[in-house]
Amino acid sequence: MALWGGRFTQAADQRFKQFNDSLRFDYRLAEQDIVGSVAWSKALVTVGVLTADEQRQLEDALNVLLEEVRANPQQILQSDAEDIHSWVEGKLIDKVGQLGKKLHTGRSRNDQVATDLKLWCKETVRELLTANRQLQSALVETAQANQDAVMPGYTHLQRAQPVTFAHWCLAYVEMLARDESRLQDTLKRLDVSPLGCGALAGTAYEIDREQLAGWLGFTSATRNSLDSVSDRDHVLELLSDAAIGMVHLSRFAEDLIFFNSGEAGFVELSDRVTSGSSLMPQKKNPDALELIRGKCGRVQGALTGMMMTLKGLPLAYNKDMQEDKEGVFDALDTWLDCLHMAALVLDGIQVKRSRCQDAAQQGYANATELADYLVAKGVPFREAHHIVGEAVVEAIRQGKPLEALSLADLQKFSLVISEDVYPILSLQSCLDKRAAKGGVSPQQVAQAIDYAKARLA
């Protein structure tokens, strides 16, 4: 059943109908559409369009429909209705007859769909926040269990300075905390109701829109009807949040893919999140992580696509806006799935401490410590940097780590070097000296774990 047609003398071409209809994806807004309709029925009582008895009949029927939808949402797709609004109204009329035709009084699908989508986004943000915090907690637990796992830190994918696996985990906790903050900030701007703005100029009925917003769980009502029905900033913001969040998850995945490789061998992933090869029986592939990394692109694409859709639209509503739903549904579903999968990857991961330690002792990751040692002896840093570079070349020539060079060898480059240099070059000393806030010292890492646990409690 179309909600329009009196103006037309010909039926829509079936090809146009298939092109135009949105039920195949906006059926996901069924619950929100029903909840919004219940609130609207209450508002119509306040302006005398419905009696209290009529409103009760409508609300009872809508609540029955809500339970039917929750029990079997796929039933909606068996209909040839144009969109979810048409489907809900048609089902309501089936249940209460002509009374159902009064519900749309003073309401447009423009403010209706804007309201439905905001309600859906609010619920989805709450799910994302929960999944985000669960992943943060999993990272903190993994960090706590691996505070003593020393490994090389990298810049340019070359060994740079020693860190710990715990410190690595906590880096991603920081990223996820920013993702959490962005979602919470987006929720503030999302939490305003457009219902009652009509097609574009507002409703002709003196409805208390603030009261209506409260019934729907919004903190307030929007202030401009033109903007309200054409605003999709919340979609862009959520897609941006998702795009940034997926970049973080993609980097997390890439790190672990490398750590799990035969070349690094720092971790072993659980059999539960890996797969094999149809040809090579020895393979154990990090498919969960590769899919997280791969799915990042589709989320970036959804953001770019939505920006291009909106950039040239005049006020107010245009059918182009129907393109908002598939992208945001898919992007937020993808982000949510990847948050859950990342947490599952951490459940059962094994950190190979000895392999990590061996790698940290290679690659001259303690070279900066030698430079700092020279600075403490009064050598200007730029000169110390050059001296250590020459010492590294000598160590490479001899096939030794820096700490294995003899004192005589080291003193070829600077006579200020003495026996007290050797304790400075140990991995533990490298870690202990990074004791400023945010550093990799055991004390700082322990404090960071305690802080994160308290924040997430």
Swiss-Prot record:
Catalytic function, reaction form: 2-(N(omega)-L-arginino)succinate = fumarate + L-arginine
GO molecular function: argininosuccinate lyase activity
Keywords: Amino-acid biosynthesis, Arginine biosynthesis, Cytoplasm, Lyase
EC number: 4.3.2.1
Location relative to the cell: Cytoplasm
One GO CC term, this protein: cytosol
Pathway: Amino-acid biosynthesis; L-arginine biosynthesis; L-arginine from L-ornithine and carbamoyl phosphate: step 3/3
GO BP terms in the entry: arginine biosynthetic process via ornithine; L-arginine biosynthetic process
Pfam family, one: Lyase_1
Gene3D superfamilies, alphabetized: Fumarase/aspartase (C-terminal domain), Fumarase/aspartase (Central domain), Fumarase/aspartase (N-terminal domain)
Main location class: cytoplasm
HAMAP family noted in UniProt: Arg_succ_lyase
NCBIfam families xref list: argH, PRK12308.1
Family: Belongs to the lyase 1 family. Argininosuccinate lyase subfamily.
Designated name of the protein: Argininosuccinate lyase
